Each structure stands twice: as structure tokens, then as C-alpha cells.
Design a protein with these regions (language model features):
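GHKL-family ATPase ATP-binding module
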Residues: 2-18, 25, 47-49, 57-59, ...
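Conserved short strand/loop->alpha-helix "switch" segment adjacent to the catalytic nucleotide/phosphoryl-transfer site
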Residues: 30-49
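A short glycine-centered beta->alpha linker in the GHKL/HATPase_c
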Residues: 85-90
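Short adenine-binding "F-helix/F-box" segment of the Bergerat
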Residues: 91-92, 99
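Helical (often loop-to-helix) elements that flank the catalytic cores of nucleotide-handling enzymes
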Residues: 92, 347-360, 563-569, 573-574
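C-terminal interaction appendages of subunits in large macromolecular complexes
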Residues: 394-413, 428-433, 444, 448-450, ...
Length: 654
């Protein structure tokens, strides 16, 4: 079911007058993290998204349908689109070409002038000038009015005025930039990270073709470069099917709406599966609003109201003995919500929560209309959904006891901490660390080796429950999972959602998974990460979850001892101290944490000055949702396919 409205090209003119100027560029180089998030992998890739966002603005306005992104041999990036081309005419106020203004002045651009773009993507709207400021070199070519115009820059400063360099029968913009290695700690682009975001953008913008080419990787057979094309004719409908592809569907239909209410374009796709979790991915102007906001609230309100009214009118709830709550309508629900807002207000800890109040009513109205129509037209599917809601309510009723067990042991009630927890003496969460350690024996060593001031230890017995396959109340009945909630000081239930984790009284801002460096250890890591992703995603979003990396080897030659985390480090030790002869060096392979004594464990894995921690991040929540359900869910087929495809990369420990 769907209701559709077409995008019509916006009639606003896009010329020098549309480019507005707000402030200078030096600030970007002084505090880059303020503008692009950080100066490592995330920020490096964010540069590409800023340029791509400009091309997508052209697509949203109806003028561009193809964007090409290329990672060049030297790790520079080229982005080309077939939009109208950035204006090059004279900018009255700034007394220079509009292109130069857009490239060299922060907060200059068509997105600040409502006439040229009704809505525009890009989180900060700092756009091209910000990328320019953070690049050692940048070249911009504009194809417009039958001509090619060009300007080059170094660290944001033009090398010459905009000049005409040729004729052209196409329109569009081509940008190439070289990220500045004096600012970025990482300057090598990761194909997978870019592919993941570009795939997401293709789903969010139906009919837009986005290609990604990696000129660093050549196919030996035909000499071509590694490349992919992302294109989705059906947009969100395909997106929600992609996320759901490894789950069992409750109904085969995608409930779809594409309409405009109160001047806000709204597109939503909904599917139901037989699972127990709610997975709603929401976007504003193509930005993933991880913390939700008014669009999500409007969606939930309409879903609950419409389904409840239909069930009551159809007399389906007459024999139900338990009370039905809003959460019950969302169990097994997967949805993607995409709204376009002219002036979005972002709130929350990571500035990814939509605050515009007018959006709530608009989404509520749109969803209410389309869902009511769908339920009336599809009574069989409607009954299946309502039956699932009743099942969820009954299970939730059974889960109340389990939830109360978690709640009752809240840290505020005093003496409610799990007996196995060896707590630290400092009470400032920002300084405290909790190690989740596999097994009692390793837990004992960790307790002896830690710094008691700020490091706490919680030993976990065996493998924790795979929450991907378990009903909600079963997960909460598991002792190990209850102990994690209690030790962390996390309770269940917030104002918005009775199932959501409440981390206001979180006791540690570093939660470190510490397991053996073998296959079993990796499996336990994955089970714990699955738990946090599904039950406490805020922990990952805030950057609180880490994985410890114990060394694989201890190499000795005479009096020289060195811990090695990789085979390459071990080989280097052999080359340096053993003349390249493996037999000349004594190597101890650590299979488990228990093989180290307390002092060794502290030196290698727990001491903040020497250890290596991997921070767990989610670059793309929708893709992570798909991967967790595929790797950890009930359906074996997609998992086997994934393993066969990736077997060459697998590190199999025998």
C-alpha cells in the first residue's frame, strides 16, 4: 500500500545571490572536531559525506540523478555529480565569484537561502569550505552554461581566481581533495565505510545512482578497478527489505507511505517480523537520527492509536486479560522513517535527536491515514499483526517479574550490587572502568592485577545468552545479564519507552570486554556486543564500550622480553634479536587470560599507559541491525552464505 507524490524541481533560482555568508575559515583548522566530529577515521570519511551531501541537495531539488565517488591511488577523493554546477557568477557583496565564496567562506552556500533549496542535507551545513580548509590541496571544476570553470586551493586559500578552462556539453560539479595529514591521524580511506553510507543514501533517495570506485584495487583478470553502483528504484521499501532479509516475516507486505503534511515530506516503510525487538531507523534530511526525536514520537503515537482503534473496532481485544501498552504494538516491527525538514533543530548528547515540534503532528497524521487504510483493506494481515500484539502483551506481563528483579537491584537501593563484582573505590563514573571478564579464574587474576582505585571487575560465567534469539523476558531472567544491569547501575524504562535502558545513573564510562584471544573469546565478545546493541545501544552511541586486546605472544631472547599483539610484531622481534631464525627466539603463545599472572595482565591489558583498547562504534545503525540479525539470529542460510563469502578473510584458530 502506498501513497506517492512526485518531486518537482524547485523553481528557486540558484545563482550568486543565493549564496549567503556567515563566518571565517580559520576556526575550522583550529578546532576541526567541532565541525566534522573528530580527526580520525570518522572525520576523514565525513569529508566525503559533506561533498556528497551538496550533490544530494541538487538531487532533492530535482536536478541531479548521478553521483560518482572515486578513491584515487594517492587516497585523494573525487566526487562528481550531474547537477546544475555551483554558480560562478559575480557575488555582489563579497566582490568575487560565487564559487570562490562557497569554497572559502564557512557557512556560505545555497542551503542557507530558502529560495534555492527547500531542504538540504549535511549535519552542520559547513560543506565544501570546511573540506577545503582541512585539505592540503583541492580542485573544483564546474560544468555550467556550456563551459568548464576551475579553481584550485591549498589549505582553503585559492591559488588563482576562478578561470574558464574549456567547453562542455554536460552540467555538474567535480571536486577532488587531499585530506591534510597534519590534522587527520588517519588518511587512508576505508572502502567498506564509504560503501555502507553510500548504499544508505541510495536507499534514502530512490532513483539516485551513486557509484563508488576504488582505484587502489585492480581486478587482476580484466584490469578494472574495484567498484559498485548503489541504486534503488523503490527506496525505503527496498531498504526495509534489506534490513529484514535475514529475519522471518510476519507479513510479506511492506506498508509504505510517501506524502507531504504541513509542508514536510514524509516517507516511511514498515515491516513486521516474528522476532521480539523493535528496530526503527529514523532520518532527517538523510541524517540518521540515532537518538530519535519528534518524528519517531509521532510515528509511535500514530501506530499505537491506529492499531488499537482497529483492534477494538474489530472486537479482537474482548477476551484479552492483560492490559496492552504502546510497546506491545512495536514488537517485531522494523521501520525506516525519512523526513525532510527545512530548518531542523538537533538536540541530545550526540546532536542526533530531532527537536522540531511541528514534525510530530505531521508524521502522526500521515501514518494514521495510511495505516488505517491498509488495515481496512488487508483484514488477514491486520489480524496477524493484532495477534502478535496480544502475544507481546501476554509475554510482557510475564516479563514484569523479571523486569522488577532488574529494577529492584538498582544501585540506589544500597547493597544491591552483584556478589561477584569487585568494585573500585572511586565513585566518579567518568574515571571508572568495568572489566567484563570471561570465567572465574581469569576474573581472579584480573582482581589481583587491577588498580583498585578506578578499575572494577565483573566475572561472567561461560557464554552469556544470545539475546538475538531470546524473548525479552527470558533475557532479563538470565543471571549474567541481570548482573550486568545491576553492576552498571542501569535500570529499565524511560519517559518515552518502558523497555528502553535508563543510563542516567551509569556507574562506569568505560566498559571493557576482556576475553581470551581465541575463537571462544571472540564468540563471547560478539554475544556481549549483541546484548549492548539490542538492550543498551546508548552505551555504544556514547562511546563507552571497549574490547581489551591481550597480547598473543611473549617473545624472549636472553634478557630481552617483548609482548607481541600481531604476527608482524613477533616477526620483527625474531628479525631483530634472532637474526630472522624462529628457533633462536623463545616464543610463548597465550591462548587464554589465565596463562598470564596478575602482573603480566596489568602490564599488557589493563594498564591505561600501555594497553590497547578497541572502541566499539556504530557507523551505520541500519547495516549493523542487518548484520547482527544475520550473524546471531535464527536463520542459518544467510549466515552460511556470509561465512562462505568471507572464508578467505577468516582467521581460523585450530
Amino acid at each position: 500500500i502506498m501513497s506517492e507524490e512526485q518531486i518537482t524541481p524547485n523553481n528557486g533560482s540558484y545563482s550568486a545571490d543565493s549564496i549567503q555568508v556567515l563566518e571565517g575559515l580559520e576556526a575550522v583548522r583550529k578546532r576541526p572536531a567541532m565541525y566534522i566530529g573528530d580527526i580520525s577515521v570518522k572525520g576523514l570519511h565525513h569529508l566525503v559525506y559533506e561533498i556528497v551531501d551538496n550533490s544530494i541537495d541538487e538531487a532533492l531539488a530535482g536536478y541531479c540523478d548521478h553521483i560518482e565517488v572515486t578513491i584515487n591511488e594517492d587516497n585523494s577523493i573525487t566526487v562528481q555529480d550531474n547537477g546544475r554546477g555551483i554558480p560562478v557568477d559575480y557575488h555582489e557583496k563579497e566582490k568575487k565569484s560565487a564559487l570562490e565564496v562557497a569554497m572559502t567562506v564557512l557557512h556560505a552556500g545555497g542551503k542557507f537561502d530558502k529560495g534555492s533549496y527547500k531542504v538540504s542535507g549535511g549535519l552542520h551545513g559547513v560543506g565544501m569550505s570546511c573540506v577545503n580548509a582541512l585539505s592540503t590541496h583541492m580542485t573544483t571544476q564546474v560544468f555550467r552554461d556550456g563551459k568548464i570553470y576551475q579553481q584550485e586551493y591549498e589549505i582553503g586559500k585559492p591559488l588563482y581566481s576562478v578561470k574558464e578552462v574549456g567547453v562542455s556539453d554536460i552540467t555538474g560539479t567535480r571536486q577532488q581533495f587531499w585530506p591534510d595529514d597534519t590534522i587527520f591521524t588517519e588518511t587512508v580511506y576505508d572502502y567498506k565505510i564509504l560503501a555502507s553510507r553510500l548504499r544508505e543514501l541510495a536507499y534514502l533517495n530512490a532513483g539516485l545512482r551513486i557509484s563508488l570506485t576504488d582505484r587502489r584495487v585492480v581486478n587482476e583478470e580484466d584490469g578494472s578497478f574495484k567498484s559498485e553502483v548503489f541504486y534503488s528504484e523503490e527506496g525505503l521499501r527496498e531498504f526495509v527489505r534489506f534490513i529484514e532479509s535475514s529475519r522471518e516475516h510476519l507479513i510479506n507486505d511492506v506498508i509504505y507511505l510517501n506524502s507531504e503534511k504541513q509542508g514536510i515530506p514524509i516517507e516511511i516503510a514498515i515491516m513486521y517480523n516474528t522476532g521480539f525487538s523493535e528496530n526503527v531507523h529514523s532520518y532527517v534530511n538523510n541524517i540518521n537520527t540515532i537518538e530519535g526525536g519528534t518524528h519517531l514520537a509521532g510515528f509511535r503515537r500514530a501506530l499505537t492509536r491506529t492499531l488499537k482503534k482497529y483492534a477494538e473496532d474489530s472486537k479482537m481485544l474482548e477476551k484479552v486479560k492483560v492490559e496492552i501498552s504502546g510497546d506491545d504494538f512495536r514488537e517485531g516491527l522494523t521501520a525506516v522513517i525519512s523526513v525532510k525538514v527545512a530548518e531542523p533543530q538537533f538536540e541530545g548528547q550526540t546532536k542526533t535527536k530531532l527537536g522540531n515540534n511541528e514534525v510530530m503532528g505531521a508524521v502522526d497524521q500521515a501514518v494514521g491515514e495510511v495505516l488505517a487504510y491498509y488495515l481496512e483493506e488487508h483484514p488477514k494481515e491486520a489480524k496477524t499483526i493484532v495477534d502478535k500484539v496480544i502475544l507481546a502483551a501476554t509475554a510482557r506481563h510475564a516479563a514484569r517479574k523479571a523486569r522488577e528483579m532488574v529494577q529492584r537491584k538498582s544501585p540506589m537501593s544500597g547493597g544491591g550490587l552483584p556478589g561477584k563484582l569487585a568494585d573500585c573505590s572511586d565513585k566518579d563514573p567518568s574515571k571508572c572502568e568495568l572489566f567484563l571478564v570471561e570465567g572465574d579464574s581469569a576474573g581472579g587474576t584480573a582482581k589481583q592485577g587491577r588498580n583498585r582505585m578506578f578499575q572494577a571487575i565483573l566475572p561472567l560465567r561461560g557464554k552469556i545468552l544470545n539475546v538475538e534469539k531470546a524473548m525479552y523476558h527470558k533475557a532479563l531472567e538470565s543471571d549474567e545479564i541481570r548482573n550486568i544491569y545491576t553492576a552498571l547501575g542501569v535500570t529499565i524504562g524511560t519517559e518515552d519507552d518502558s523497555k528502553e535502558a535508563n543510563i542516567e545513573k551509569l556507574r562506569y564510562h568505560k566498559i571493557i570486554i576482556m576475553t581470551d584471544a581465541d575463537v571462544d573469546g571472540s564468540h563471547i565478545d560478539t554475544l556481549i556486543m549483541t546484548f549492548f546493541f539490542r538492550y543498551m545501544p546508548q552505551i555504544i552511541q556514547n562511546g563507552y564500550l571497549y574490547i581489551a586486546t591481550p597480547p598473543l605472544y611473549l617473545c624472549k631472547k636472553g634478557k630481552v622480553e617483548e609482548y607481541c599483539w600481531t604476527d608482524a610484531q613477533r616477526q620483527k622481534f625474531i628479525d631483530t634479536y634472532g637474526g630472522g631464525l624462529e628457533n633462536a627466539v623463545h616464543t610463548q603463545r597465550y591462548k587464554g587470560l589465565g596463562e598470564m599472572n596478575a602482573q603480566q595482565l596489568w602490564e599488557t591489558t589493563m594498564d591505561p599507559d600501555n594497553r590497547m583498547l578497541k572502541q566499539v562504534n556504530i557507523d551505520n545503525a541500519a547495516e549493523a541491525d542487518y548484520i547482527f540479525s544475520m550473524l546471531m539470529g535464527e536463520d542459518v542460510g544467510p549466515r552460511r552464505e556470509f561465512i562462505e563469502e568471507n572464508a578467505t578473510y577468516a582467521n581460523i584458530d585450530t
